[in-house]
Amino acid sequence: MVNYPALGPSGHSATWKSVDGAHESTVSLQWENEGWTANGTLGADNAQFVIRMSATWMVQQFLLFRDLEEPDLWLATDGHGRWGEMNGAHRTELDGCVDIDLRGTPFTNVIPIRRLPLLVGHSAQQNVITIDIETLAVVVKPQMYTRIDEHTWRYFSFALDCDVEVTVDEHGFVTDEPNSFIRVTESVVGIANDWLGLLLHRPKKSL
């Protein structure tokens, strides 16, 4: 079952603004090498991320950039629940996880929303890799996703004992996350040829 229509090969982009208007979060999605590459910014943390996903929105790699041209954190999975760093270190505490969660962007919730084959009223629980941008701490937290209706999802954090209902568009992209973000722009973007090239040509931080 497919929840939302497939995105076109020309890609997709979105910008969200924090409800206080102080920060923006962006994502640009490109189709390449039989999968999706998401390049995003975290305005509140002055950081950038890259998430490499399969055609079915399964996370394969995650890169986080803060102050350096090289990634501060680079995680990858073999597609069977085993996680490690790109230097070869096996992160056993992450094994079995499927998704990445970043506090500073609604996009990491778009990934399970588009991937999970849920009917209205159904739920799915899974362990999520939660990353603290400031400290680079990586913690596994259980979350539950429930599809309320065609354009509304609820996700519940067992660790925080709280839930959030978000509104999504026809593509499953978050348009409104109460008390956190509201989407201000959405557009189709051009095709990128090489995802590593995106890393090399990602926008430089201003001093």
Where are these predicted regions, by residue range?
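Beta-strand secondary-structure signal
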Residues: 37-39, 50, 63, 152-156, ...
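Solvent-exposed helix/loop surface patches that form functional interfaces
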Residues: 1-24, 72-154, 158-159, 175, ...
